[in-house]
């Protein structure tokens, strides 16, 4: 594979492995630029870090099978990957890559190929990622739990009883928490859980989470990656805890609804351990 990083023409070559690695590096570059703009949420940051580790490992392994003169670093592959995106998105063969031609350019009659130019659809002026406010999707017979003036121990027990009546599959859970002298918070959660033969349930995916203050204003949201799916259960718990820690900042007392919401999801996996402060409540 020729290395001409100082020109506009870069040979990608016919190998699908190189194409895949280079394109992944381009995706990583996009994630990093989003991160610089502070436009990535917690699962996005996790995805960035995991993708970088996987690419570094795969490049190291792949380079062992390449002649020394053709080995490329992650940064070099990022440049190629970004140009590959230009070819794919804008169907522009002059984007600067030789040896890489999109399938749709060679098979324009294929019904799965787009027949429009993406440049015809510029982004809407004045809108950015933070402006997007979507409610978690509706599901049949959603669970709604109202917890008013209830201590955390009783609240968790009520939640556990309510949630355990749910069937396998997707669920929507609304938690309304209102305690004297504590900021009220409404938490909407979408997720999917699996029921095992022994009756034990585990959270398999977390699709999205919105948190609203007492005036109905969206104060935090979590949209998971990969078709709205957190990749594993541990990630989901860690992301939620981090999210709610941010909500707690700046308040003299913890937001009990936040702790309650984390407790709900913890019923589908690892045991939720009470802090010393909570143990007496």
From Swiss-Prot:
One of its GO terms (molecular function) is RNA binding. A motif (Nuclear localization signal) lies at residues 50-55. The keyword Ribosomal protein does not apply. InterPro entries: NS1, uS15_NS1_RNA-bd_sf. Its main location: host cell. Residues 1-103 are annotated as: G1P2-binding. It is found in: Host cytoplasm; Host nucleus. GO terms for biological process: symbiont-mediated suppression of host ISG15-protein conjugation; symbiont-mediated suppression of host PKR/eIFalpha signaling; symbiont-mediated suppression of host type I interferon-mediated signaling pathway. Pfam families: Flu_B_NS1. Keywords: Host cytoplasm, Host nucleus, Host-virus interaction, Inhibition of host innate immune response by virus, Inhibition of host interferon signaling pathway by virus, Inhibition of host ISG15 by virus, Inhibition of host PKR by virus, Interferon antiviral system evasion, RNA-binding, Viral immunoevasion. One of its GO terms (cellular component) is host cell cytoplasm. The keyword RNA-binding applies. Residues 1-93 are annotated as: RNA-binding and homodimerization. Binds and inhibits the conjugation of the ubiquitin-like G1P2/ISG15 protein to its target proteins. Since G1P2/ISG15 is an early antiviral protein, NS1 may inhibit the host antiviral response. Prevents EIF2AK2/PKR activation, either by binding double strand RNA or by interacting directly with EIF2AK2/PKR. Also binds poly(A) and U6 snRNA. Homodimer. Interacts with and inhibits human G1P2 conjugation by UBE1L. Belongs to the influenza B viruses NS1 family. This is Non-structural protein 1. It comes from Influenza B virus (strain B/HT/1984). The gene is NS.
């Amino acid at each position: 594979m020729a290395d001409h990083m100082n020109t506009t023409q870069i040979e990608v070559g016919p190998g699908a492995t190189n194409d895949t690695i280079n394109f992944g590096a381009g995706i990583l570059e996009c994630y990093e630029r989003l991160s610089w703009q502070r436009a990535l949420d917690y699962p996005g940051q996790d995805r960035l870090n995991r993708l970088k580790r996987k690419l570094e490992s795969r490049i190291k392994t792949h380079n062992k099978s390449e002649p020394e003169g053709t080995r490329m670093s992650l940064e070099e592959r990022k440049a190629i990957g970004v140009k590959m995106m230009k070819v794919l998105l804008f169907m522009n063969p002059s984007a600067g890559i030789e040896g890489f031609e999109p399938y749709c350019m060679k098979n324009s009659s294929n019904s799965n190929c787009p027949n429009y130019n993406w440049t015809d659809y510029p982004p809407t002026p004045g809108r950015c990622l933070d402006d997007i406010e979507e409610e978690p999707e509706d599901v049949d017979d959603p669970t709604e739990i109202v917890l008013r003036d209830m201590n955390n121990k009783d609240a968790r027990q009520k939640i556990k009883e309510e949630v355990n009546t749910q069937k396998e599959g997707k669920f929507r859970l609304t938690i309304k928490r209102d305690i004297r002298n504590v900021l009220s918070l409404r938490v909407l959660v979408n997720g999917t859980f699996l029921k095992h033969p022994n009756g034990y349930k585990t959270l398999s995916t977390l699709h999205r989470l919105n948190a609203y203050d007492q005036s109905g204003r969206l104060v935090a949201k979590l949209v998971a990656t990969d078709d709205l799916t957190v990749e594993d259960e541990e990630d989901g718990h860690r992301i939620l805890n981090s999210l709610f820690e941010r909500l707690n900042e700046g308040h003299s007392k913890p937001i009990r609804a936040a702790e309650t919401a984390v407790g709900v999801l913890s019923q589908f996996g690892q045991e939720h351990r009470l802090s010393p402060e909570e143990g007496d409540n």
